[in-house]
Amino acid sequence: MARPDLHERISSLRKLRVAQERVRVRRQVGRRDGVRLEIDGRWLTGFCSNDYLGLSQQFEVVAALQDAAARDGAGATASHLICGHHTAHETLERDIAEWLGYPSALLFGSGFIANLAVQQALLSEEDDVCVQDRLNHASLLDATRLAGCRLRRYPHLDVEGAMRQLKGAPEGAAMLASDGVFSMDGDVAPLRALSLVARMQEALFYVDDAHGVGVLGPQGRGCVADAGLGVAEVPLQLVTLGKALGGYGAVVVGEEALIRHLAETARPYIYTTALPPAQVAATLAAVRLARRDDWRRTRLTELIGTFRDGARRHGFELMASDTPIQPLLCGEEPTVMAMSAALEQAGFMVGAIRPPTVPEGKARLRVTLSALHTPQQVQALVDAIVQARDVVSRQPQRALA
């Protein structure tokens, strides 16, 4: 029997995406200046990046990268366990562990890689199970599938659902994994309650706080610290370096024994080149600023309030988010795509999020705020969204939810 032709399969899938108007397109950014982006020769005010504290172009951060590149070169040249583990890597692991109140840390190339490494190294038996919130990030869900253990999911934020799923899988070792801040909804997981569930069910509680660290909690220590928890309740926690810290990579902090096990057995850690030391040096500078500059978080909180007050005043449906991620529900895909296009015409770049990233009927504008935005820019965005709604609502079959 002939094998399926991969080229034919790819062609068919492409035709289906075109018919569904779900083709994904990369937009090329020419230059950046703070929150402004040059795209297709036009300067747009961006409300779409994860640079929550505005550190990616901060002078001290860029200078640290340039100085380290001149000294150490463009790359680490090897994996951590050969000769790629530089002083900058060791210092960053130590500084982030100390900042978050954990005894140990391990640096990875990305959050996706780190989530895979954690589950592959810890959930290695067929009977092992990872119980997850249904809206967890794709990297957490894919990591379970790739690790080969069982995946059980509970309804979003449903603590009792998490308990039921753990009780229903008593045979092997168990991990309870949750986002801290959910990337598409902007809401925060009930970490205290989930930590109690994990303890009662003898499961390791693992929190992916990609969007929380730097923004929430004392000194920006994230969701775990904001909930009054630490290593005793959350033995492993993921911190990404490409969101509030403005760089690239990820760090897993945790108990010493767990971190040592990851360093010795996690294949995504062992068999990959370490991050460039210059990039790590930039993140070291960003961590210092994130810890020190409470004004960035204060300003961000004020801007979030400005946006939510303005959107509510005009009758928009908001989600339960007090974080820089502010989704604006639009309903169907054609509506959100038309809204995003209208905003671009008005000079704003806002991401349109649609299925399969979010459920059917839950397409949304994903507004993200930065400490670099001004109140005037936020108000101008609200005004532009109102105008876009009016324009789109007059088009056939275009009604904002």
UniProtKB/Swiss-Prot annotation:
EC assignment: 2.3.1.47
Cofactor: pyridoxal 5'-phosphate
InterPro entries xref list: Aminotransferase_I/II_large, AON_synthase_class-II, AONS_Archaea/Proteobacteria, AONS_Proteobacteria, PyrdxlP-dep_Trfase, PyrdxlP-dep_Trfase_major, PyrdxlP-dep_Trfase_small
Gene symbol of the encoding locus: bioF
Keywords: Biotin biosynthesis, Pyridoxal phosphate, Transferase
HAMAP family assigned to the protein according to its UniProt record, in alphabetical order: BioF_aminotrans_2 (MF_01693)
Residues where pyridoxal 5'-phosphate binds: G111, F112, S183, H211, T240
Binding-site residues, substrate: R24, H137, T357
PANTHER family documented for this protein: 8-AMINO-7-OXONONANOATE SYNTHASE, CLASS II AMINOTRANSFERASE/8-AMINO-7-OXONONANOATE SYNTHASE
Protein name stated in the entry: 8-amino-7-oxononanoate synthase
Function: Catalyzes the decarboxylative condensation of pimeloyl-[acyl-carrier protein] and L-alanine to produce 8-amino-7-oxononanoate (AON), [acyl-carrier protein], and carbon dioxide.
Database matches in SUPFAM superfamilies: PLP-dependent transferases (SSF53383)
Pfam assignment, any one: Aminotran_1_2
Subunit structure: Homodimer.
Organism: Xanthomonas campestris pv. campestris (strain ATCC 33913 / DSM 3586 / NCPPB 528 / LMG 568 / P 25)
Reactions listed under catalytic activity: 6-carboxyhexanoyl-[ACP] + L-alanine + H(+) = (8S)-8-amino-7-oxononanoate + holo-[ACP] + CO2
